[in-house]
Amino acid sequence: MDAIWQGLSGIFEVVLIAGLGFFLAKKGWFWENAAKDLTRLTMTVALPPLMIHSLYANFTHDALIAAAPDLMLPFVSIFASYLAGHVLASLLHISKGRRGIFICTCCIANAIFIGVPVNVALFGEASVPSCMLYYLANTTMFWALGAYLIIRDAGGQHRFTLKEMLLKLRTPPLMGFAAGVILLLANVPIPHFAMAAMKYVGGMATPMALMVIGIQMSQIPLSSIHFDKDLVGAMAGRFLLAPLCLFLLLPVIPVSEMSSKVFLMQAGMPAMTNMTILATAVGADAEYSTTVNCVSLVLGVFFVPFYMYMLS
């Protein structure tokens, strides 16, 4: 019961902060590109120092090495949900122009911008290393498998080279995480004032990210949403199929208690925003992708309590 209440308390925090962003957006407090600007501030300024501070605050050299094997589970579970997404797309007769986006939704989550703040709110900063392990697997699988499917939706056949994939993985949060890992493994001490500064700057990440979610939710045009089989199936894949694949693999690929909680939460996060960006860039069905992103964002608020109940 205590675990459920702890989870619900974290959920209330998430909903209240996102609700504040929603309320202020409806009142006209934000400028036109506020969501984009705050997202950039969160990704490039707040999250990198949060990565380093969290590693130093919650891990030692030996503990970090012991956590590395946990990386296998997210790779296997994402690939399993990728295969399951293919099966579901065939069963529902998803049109070829949407099939890549549909499958991508089933297996790829918004593991960094939404995943990290939600997990930090629920489990504290100790969850950040596990979040980053899932994020590494999630981003790698998106550019290795998902991106090709979306490009194929638009009639293209481009496959990303290893060099292109590595460049796509070079994001500020992952670079911050990599820097923290290298410094910690090298036993490099960080001065107290630097740790304090990183704590304060990194502390902006969760409230800013959640307020951006509220802003984005306030901009969703309800008239453009049609709950057909393509949308309902994608939501089932995102919030039921992906977490189920990971849940079933937990007894097969054992991980730490924290990683098991975080990975399950990460697997059930809303759809990845890069999916819509790529769909727009290559000429795939961007409208469908945008709708999937928006609806998954709203439904994510309601599915988090369900995942917490499963964990308890």
Briefly describe each language-model feature range.
Residues 1-312:
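Alpha-helical transmembrane segments of multi-pass small-molecule/ion transporters
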